[in-house]
Regions:
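Generic, low-specificity signal for short hydrophobic/alpha-helical stretches with a mild N-terminal bias
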Residues: 1, 10-13, 40-43, 47, ...
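Charged, compositionally biased N-terminal leader segments and the immediate start
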Residues: 1-34
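Short, compositionally biased low-complexity segments
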Residues: 3, 32-38, 83-87
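Functionally constrained cores in energy, signaling, and assembly domains
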Residues: 10, 35, 43, 69, ...
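N-terminal interaction modules that seed assembly of large macromolecular complexes
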Residues: 26-64
Length: 100
């Protein structure tokens, strides 16, 4: 039996919102469409702690970025998206993490 691991929905939401900030809504929709995650188009996960966002989805999104934009472009976009994720997470949840 293969175990599947999941991120909290909140993390999946942060990743998708950060992608939208960097690539725009149409760019995110195109990546979601190409990675066979059409159910997430205009339907981001809830802002809660439930573990329902699979690691495999995050992996597929990264792979699709590289497929569409090439190795260098995909890596550059992934870096910018990662920075946006960090900034978004700190901005939204600094109080919960004890940051001021």
């Amino acid at each position: 039996m293969i175990d599947t691991f999941h991120y909290p929905n909140r993390m999946g939401r942060i990743i998708l919102l950060s992608m939208e900030e960097v690539m725009g809504r149409n760019g995110v929709n195109a990546v979601l469409n190409l990675s066979s995650h059409k159910t997430l188009i205009e339907n981001y996960p809830a802002d809660d702690s439930k573990l329902n966002f699979p690691f495999s989805t995050v992996s597929a999104l990264g792979g699709t970025l590289e497929q569409v934009y090439g190795p260098h472009g995909g890596r550059g976009l992934a870096t910018r998206i990662g920075r946006a994720c960090f900034n978004y997470g700190v901005r939204q949840y600094s109080g919960q993490m004890g940051l001021t």
